[in-house]
Amino acid sequence: MIIVTGAAGFIGSNLVKALNNLGRSDIIAVDDLTDGTKMFNLADCEIADYLDKADFIEQIAQGQFDGKVEVIFHQGACSSTTEWDGKFMMANNYEYSKTLLHFCERNGSQFIYASSASVYGGSDKFIEQRELEKPLNVYAYSKFLFDQYVRQHNFTTQVAGLRYFNVYGPREQHKGGMASVAFHFNNQIKASGICRLFQGHDGFEDGKQLRDFVYVEDVVKVNLWLWQNPGISGVYNCGTGQAQSFNDVANAVIAYHGKGEIEYIPFPDKLKGAYQSYTQADLTQLRAAGYTQAFKTVEEGVPEYLDWLAAQHFIGQ
């Protein structure tokens, strides 16, 4: 069987759907549905069972899954970069991940997990090297620490981590303020015809802060490729390799709707010193490992995403 943690979340649910498209429904979906609206992400998916994340880790400890699991796609985490409860973050992200990793090692199961580009923090280079990793918040630190743990041990099973850059696309609507700018810009254009972007900061002009915006479909493809290549382990960047500006995203949304304009708002004081103004994945190691597929640009991915959003009807919309 296949286990997907964070299965009702953004990337996890896209992964479940992609596995369904490959003919797999022997999937245990693990999540926390305290936010019941996340069920929409699984409503069109086929799974064998659903387990709350606390019940799942208990059953792992009891040995109920021993010898039964082909792969764990560990996508579940507290992903809020504004959460500063370190004790909670370490238990939820770091210790939980270690428990699943050691289960996979004992059982010979593949372990493919979500890391994050946030581990690079204020760095201006994004290469999988220790000296470039400078986390700026406790979420990033929890991800960094687990990557370090993986690096320090020689596991006999596949252990592969993907440092996601700025992922956007279908099934992120439950994330609220943490959803992508593509999602928010789309809502803003529909509501008022105006996209609101931050003014210049940190040496960047208005709206010209640069991020590596990567479409969720492409992120899922890298996960599936790792699963299909169990001999590949390590920690890899997962982005397009090409930074684009927030203006690019706003203009893609405006072009899609055929209307709209951009308004620049003051850069928030609370984000100063804790904000990545530039990210761009260095894909050298991923390419060297054998991944050859192309990644969609903002101009390609955003219209596809907005087509999907236009066809959805979520609670509150």
Swiss-Prot record:
Co-factor binding comment: Binds 1 NADP(+) per subunit.
Entry cofactors: NADP(+)
EC number: 5.1.3.20
Disulfide bonds: none
Catalytic reaction annotation: ADP-D-glycero-beta-D-manno-heptose = ADP-L-glycero-beta-D-manno-heptose
Cross-referenced HAMAP family: Heptose_epimerase (MF_01601)
Protein name: ADP-L-glycero-D-manno-heptose-6-epimerase
Organism whose genome encodes this protein: Shewanella loihica (strain ATCC BAA-1088 / PV-4)
Upper taxonomic lineage: Bacteria, Pseudomonadati, Pseudomonadota, Gammaproteobacteria, Alteromonadales
